């Protein structure tokens, strides 16, 4: 039995396009994976620890082979606990709206909290980084209100998908699927794209 963790980066609840497409994906997944566990994680639920001075100092201490102390130790434990919650799953679904050409800051906060040496990555001065997440796969739902790949620069740029795809591969997760719905506000026939995105999510969910 596998565990699929859905991480939602949209704070818009029932009005969220990315969450609606994710629901279609998950319904299809349940049909073909009836014994698997599905866990929901709303990244806006207040459970993410902050990643401030103590956490940054703890990360560098661990990088240097030292043990964090005091506030740094507490921040490090919070990072480990957050990572373990993520690592408990072997399949991931991210629903990610575009914010200002990139990802919502809550998703960046999540990434900053768990991207720690010995947890998500290893590092060798000669050979560089090694992703430590093995035997995992991820699907990502990308939505945008205005940006579209065939629209001009006045409609924005995409630092959303390149960033998250690169981070996932950096962690060691290179079995990736993506469903895109864009744009949903700047296109007269948005319903056509919406239906196509839900159909793609349904197909991807069944095969995931």
For the regions a language model picked out, list residue spans one by one.
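N-terminal beta1-alpha1-beta2 submodule of the flavodoxin-like/Rossmannoid cofactor-binding fold
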Residues: 1-96, 101-112, 116, 199-208
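Residues at the starts of beta-strands that form the adenosine-phosphate
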Residues: 3, 37, 137-138, 175
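Cofactor-binding loop segments of dinucleotide-utilizing enzymes, especially the Rossmann-like FAD-
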Residues: 9, 143, 181
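Short histidine/acidic/glycine/proline-rich micro-motifs that form metal-
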Residues: 11-13, 147, 185-187
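Short, well-ordered alpha-helix to beta-strand connector turns
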Residues: 89-90, 135, 173
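Short, structured loop/turn "capping" segments at alpha-beta junctions
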Residues: 117-122, 174-175
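Short, glycine-/small-residue-rich phosphate/pyrophosphate-handling segment
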Residues: 122-170
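Glycine-rich phosphate/pyrophosphate-binding loop and the adjoining helix
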Residues: 150-208
